[in-house]
Amino acid sequence: MNTNLKVCTRCIYDERVSYITFDEEGVCKYCRQLESLKAEYGTGAKKGEVKFAKIIEEIKKAGKGKKYDCIIGVSGGTDSSYMLYLTKKWGLRPLAVHYDNTWNSAIATENIRKVLTALDIDLYTHVTDNKEADDILRSIFYADVSEIEASTDLALAEVMYRAAWKYKVKYVLEGHSFMEEGITPVGRNYFDGKYIKSIHKMFGKLPMKSYPLMTFSRFLFWSMFAKIQKIRPFWYIDYNKEDAKVFLEKEYDWKYYGGHHLENRSAAFFHSIYLPQKFNTDMRNNTLSALVRNGKMDRNSAWEEYNKSPHIEKDLVEYFKKRLELSDEEYDRVMKRKPKSWTEYPTYKKRFELLRPLFKILAKANLVPMSFYLKYCFPMPKDGEK
């Protein structure tokens, strides 16, 4: 690999990745973390299949006599679309849930329709007022932090909980795969309800009315009182994203949207323009590193791909400015300003850390995601520490 940077010997995470360390073999701590998760969950092995088979039986038992027995968040992307197919194959009765931040691409919207129609699955949608959604997004942009997708990610989680509560469903299935996508490094892309609300209060102009904000109390309600479990099937079973794409295209005339997270136009702006240009950060190394770890791509090819400019949708910047009512000068001024960290705004982070023992128990019981426990419930390393 042609670089003077220190790079993990197993993936392509380099010394610029937040809070990275390397062991005596040159393997980064994130590879070791994923190694531990694979062993714990039995991912793609008999152990994982047995564990997940028991979960399926528990889902069916808990859903007996109800219209639905599980919730699946859908975006029109590969993972959630394939998850819909799998749940029907497993004999489950899913309710698809979609949070519409009003930035969906036409391809994603059509993908959702095609798959749900073919599989005869009902859809529950929460649409935030587009002016309000744009006001929240614009406020995060003005805050100079990297998490402009935070409001969408948190809202989807809240909406899935609400749908589960409404229909008395005890299980939410999520299409995340740490084998195919990796896990976002510590300190990157943090979000919680207090963070979003505080930034919107500082920079927003409209009241937050239709946006489904997940506060700390609501988070505890969903996990401890409602006891809604979050299951990530791909953490247990074998999953190949490329095979899933081929299957979806063949069976449902599903269309690929051009890249990971590019099914939504605000997400596309975040990944291909905002992070690379303002923060000098490119999250493609998450997926590329996962491909290298899985032997689906060699390190040199992945490194070359990572160092190419990301694909940028034509007229995406102009669309972003028009939607958020930003002048050229205003947009340029924000993009050139010094970036800020989420640590400079109010969050629930200290509270999560204080309650770490509780969240460990909840994570083990699938009542909060294990990735939440690993990323949010430990103190950040001090300055100068890795």
Task: Tell me the role of every PLM-derived stretch.
Residues 1-70, 86-386:
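Nucleotide-activated chemistry modules centered on ATP-dependent adenylation/adenylyltransferase
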